[in-house]
A protein has these predicted regions:
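Conserved beta-strand hairpin/beta-sheet module of binuclear metal-dependent hydrolase folds
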Residues: 24-71, 174-184
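Accessory terminal helices/loops
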Residues: 217-219, 230-295
Length: 295
C-alpha cells in the first residue's frame, strides 16, 4: 500500500512538473501567455492592463482566444477593449471573433488588414489540428494605422509600430518602452518546432534582416516572440543569423547552378539549433527562398 501511494505521488509530482506555466506576469499589469503547440494554440500573447481597459496582442485560434480571455479574467475584470494582430497569419488572427464578441476592437496595420481580407480563407475552411472553425467567423481589423499607433494612460505605454514588409507585408510590433519589452509577432520566433515561416508570398528577406537589426538596436530587456520561449536581444540576433545564413547559402547555390533539391540536400543549418533542427521545415524554407529568388 505504501509503495502504491509512493508511486502515485511520484506520478503526480512528475506530471505537475512537466506541465508548463502558460501565464507569467512580466511586470505590474503586463502578462504573457505561452502558446502551447501541443494543444494547437501555438501563438504567444501579451496583454497590458491599463487604467480602464485591457490591450491584448495577437488572438491565437478561437479555442486559444477563449482560454486567453479566461486567463485575462484571472488578472482583471476591466474590459478587453483592443486586440492587436501583429500580422495576418491564421495562428495569430483566427481567434479575432471570440475577442470581438467579448467587446474588443481588432487593430492592425493597414497592410495586415488588407492581407487578411484577401488571404487565409483556405486555411479557415480546412480548420487546424483536426479542429473545425464551425461556430466561429472570420473577423477583420476595424481600427488600422499607417506607421504608428500609441496607447498611453500615464501608467502604461504601448507603441504599435509598422515594420513590414518583412515576414509579411504588414508586420507590426508592440513596444513597451517603460518595461523595455518587445512583442515581435513572427518577425522572431524562439524554439518553434518548425523553425520560421519564410514562405509568405509577400515576405521580403533582405528587409527582414534589416528589421531585425533595427529591433536589436532598441532599448529592450525582454523579447516576446511570435512562438516559443521569452527571449532577449540575443534572440533577435540568433533569428537574424539563421535567416542570413540560409539566404546566403541559397543565393550561392543558385549562382553555382544548383537545383532546388540539390540545395535542400546540401545546405547545412545545424549551427542554428533553435531554428534549423527540423529537417522538414528547413527543406520547406529552402524551397521557398529558392523559388522567390529565381523569379
Amino acid at each position: 500500500m505504501k509503495a502504491t501511494l509512493f508511486i502515485l505521488g511520484l506520478f503526480i509530482s512528475v506530471t505537475m512538473s512537466a506541465q508548463k506555466t502558460l501565464v507569467k506576469q512580466l511586470a505590474p499589469g503586463v502578462y504573457y501567455y505561452f502558446g502551447d503547440e501541443s494543444r494547437k494554440m501555438s501563438a504567444n500573447c501579451l496583454w497590458v492592463v491599463f487604467k480602464d481597459y485591457v490591450l491584448a496582442i495577437d488572438a491565437n485560434y478561437p479555442w486559444g482566444a477563449q482560454e486567453i480571455i479566461e486567463e485575462i479574467r484571472k488578472t482583471t475584470m476591466k474590459p478587453i477593449r483592443y486586440v492587436f494582430n501583429t500580422h495576418y497569419h491564421h495562428d495569430h488572427t483566427f481567434g479575432n471573433s471570440v475577442f470581438v464578441d467579448s467587446g474588443a476592437t481588432i487593430v492592425s496595420t493597414k497592410e495586415t488588414a488588407a492581407e487578411m481580407k484577401t488571404l487565409g480563407q483556405k486555411e479557415w475552411d480546412q480548420g487546424w489540428g483536426g479542429r473545425s472553425m464551425e461556430g466561429y467567423r472570420r473577423e477583420f481589423p476595424s481600427l488600422t494605422f499607417d506607421q504608428r499607433l500609441v496607447f498611453d494612460d500615464g501608467v502604461h505605454r504601448v507603441e504599435l509600430i509598422k515594420m513590414g514588409p518583412a515576414h509579411t507585408l504588414g508586420d507590426g510590433v508592440a513596444y513597451l518602452p517603460k518595461e523595455k519589452m518587445l512583442v515581435t509577432g513572427d518577425l522572431c520566433v524562439n524554439g518553434n518546432p518548425w523553425g520560421n515561416n519564410v514562405a509568405d508570398r509577400n515576405a521580403d528577406y533582405d528587409k527582414w534582416l534589416r528589421v531585425l537589426d533595427t529591433l536589436a538596436s532598441w532599448n529592450i530587456k525582454t523579447v516576446v516572440p511570435g512562438h516559443g520561449e521569452l527571449g532577449t536581444i540575443e534572440t533577435l540576433k540568433h533569428q537574424r543569423a539563421y535567416l542570413a545564413d540560409m539566404l546566403t547559402q541559397v543565393r550561392s547555390g543558385i549562382k553555382s547552378g544548383k537545383s532546388k533539391e540539390e540545395l535542400v540536400k546540401e545546405i547545412d543549418l545545424r549551427r542554428h539549433p533553435v531554428y534549423g533542427k527540423n529537417k522538414v521545415s528547413t527543406a520547406r524554407s529552402i524551397r521557398a527562398i529558392y523559388d522567390r529568388l529565381k523569379l
